[in-house]
């Protein structure tokens, strides 16, 4: 209860008055859980909570509650991904959902800084380890089947999330380049059908980072964006009537050097927009579309919290919970998991009518 109350206070402040990193003392300290995880996805199934994250064959943790204690119980895959590209041993940014008794774990394979990527899926009748079947790639960018079709010829196909509306599934994905996209899944929730003429929706795009780094000069066209770096990724869509909320991880992610951090404000932060349609357009508090660089800053670095992101939303009996990972200023190489209540009744998603 202390953890939830403290985090709720934090979000009452941060959601209503977007706290800048330059004023870390204005935000309470986040209460850490015992779970070290990057890009978590959390579900409630069979009377327990399961967290899936980046790690060998997609690591699974289990806990009796969101606050833990968390215990590593195994992995989704029992061997490397069958997709022949990227980091097959440690797939990125998994998202797990349950539809009609089947569990679907969507994952990414890629190499850092390049868009020769793919999103795959594994299925099981149980949320825990064992019994998962790897079905391979759903969509690909850079190379592979369908990668020359719109929008896959301009996106980085990683960071999957799936929104379910009725009996329909919508695959949300993207990182840097042209930003965040959504395409419809087939009824099997494991394929998108013919990629030619696919009904794709553009959801968000970063306006461009002016600062130049070595990646901008990479001779491989799949490992640079000639229009400039556009750091937005990790999208997730939640629903709280009457709006759909598009949550984004905005800024530079991962592998921070505590002695050489990015310029203030360029590290990960959580932003959001909303729409009455699951396909957008999503707008921020000022009415700016997220495809035009909009996005309300909900939570950024403060106190000892550095670069929060990799967020998702889970609905429990008490309401909607936003979970995310973050690093510590003093030791920014590990990602920690925590969560906070979302209070829509108080207007604390920054959309105060």
Curated annotation (Swiss-Prot):
Glycans are attached at residue 194. It catalyses: Endohydrolysis of (1->5)-alpha-arabinofuranosidic linkages in (1->5)-arabinans. It is found in: Secreted. InterPro entries: GH43_arabinanases, Glyco_hydro_43, Glyco_hydro_43_endo_a_Ara-ase, Glyco_hydro_beta-prop_sf. Its EC number is 3.2.1.99. Pathway: Glycan metabolism; L-arabinan degradation. The record marks 159 as: Important for catalytic activity, responsible for pKa modulation of the active site Glu and correct orientation of both the proton donor and substrate. Residues 202-227 are annotated as: Disordered. It is an enzyme of class 3 (hydrolase). GO terms for cellular component: extracellular region. Its main location: secreted. Residues 1-16 form the signal peptide. Disulfide bonds: none annotated. It comes from the Eukaryota. Pfam families: Glyco_hydro_43. The active site is at 39 (proton acceptor), 233 (proton donor). One of its GO terms (biological process) is arabinan catabolic process. GO terms for molecular function: arabinan endo-1,5-alpha-L-arabinosidase activity. Keywords: Carbohydrate metabolism, Glycoprotein, Glycosidase, Hydrolase, Polysaccharide degradation, Secreted, Signal, Xylan degradation. Endo-1,5-alpha-L-arabinanase involved in degradation of pectin. Its preferred substrate is linear 1,5-alpha-L-arabinan. Belongs to the glycosyl hydrolase 43 family. This is Probable arabinan endo-1,5-alpha-L-arabinosidase B. It comes from Aspergillus oryzae (strain ATCC 42149 / RIB 40) (Yellow koji mold).
């Amino acid at each position: 209860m202390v953890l939830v109350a403290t985090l709720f206070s934090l979000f009452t402040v941060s959601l209503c008055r977007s706290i800048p990193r330059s004023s870390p003392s204005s935000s309470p300290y986040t209460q850490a859980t015992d779970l070290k995880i990057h890009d978590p996805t959390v579900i409630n199934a069979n009377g327990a909570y399961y967290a899936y994250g980046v790690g060998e064959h997609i690591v699974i943790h289990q806990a009796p509650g969101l606050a833990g204690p968390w215990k590593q119980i195994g992995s989704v895959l029992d061997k490397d991904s069958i997709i022949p590209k990227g980091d097959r041993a440690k797939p990125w940014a998994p998202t797990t959902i349950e539809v009609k008794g089947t569990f679907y774990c969507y994952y990414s394979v890629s190499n850092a800084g390049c868009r020769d990527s793919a999103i795959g899926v594994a299925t099981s009748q149980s949320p825990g380890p064992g019994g998962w079947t790897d079905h391979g790639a759903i969509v690909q960018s850079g190379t592979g089947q369908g990668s020359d079709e719109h929008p896959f010829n301009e996106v980085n196909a990683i960071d999957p999330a799936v929104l379910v509306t009725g009996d329909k599934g919508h695959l949300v994905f993207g990182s840097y380049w042209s930003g965040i996209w959504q395409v419809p899944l087939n009824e099997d929730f494991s394929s998108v059908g013919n990629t030619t003429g696919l009904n794709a929706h553009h959801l968000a795009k970063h306006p461009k980072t002016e600062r130049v780094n070595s990646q901008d000069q990479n001779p491989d066209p799949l490992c640079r964006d000639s229009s400039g770096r556009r750091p937005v990724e990790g999208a997730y869509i939640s629903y709280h009537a009457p709006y759909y909320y598009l949550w984004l991880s905005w800024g530079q992610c991962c592998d921070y050097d505590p002695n050489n951090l990015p310029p203030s404000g360029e590290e990960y932060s959580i932003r959001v927009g909303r729409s009455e349609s699951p396909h957008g357009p999503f707008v921020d508090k000022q009415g700016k579309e997220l495809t035009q660089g909009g996005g309300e800053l909900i939570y950024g670095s403060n106190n000892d919290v550095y670069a929060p992101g990799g967020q998702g939303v889970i609905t429990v009996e008490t309401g909607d919970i936003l979970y995310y990972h973050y690093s510590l200023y003093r030791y920014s190489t590990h990602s920690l998991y925590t969560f906070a209540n979302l209070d829509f009744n108080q207007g604390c998603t920054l959309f105060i009518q």
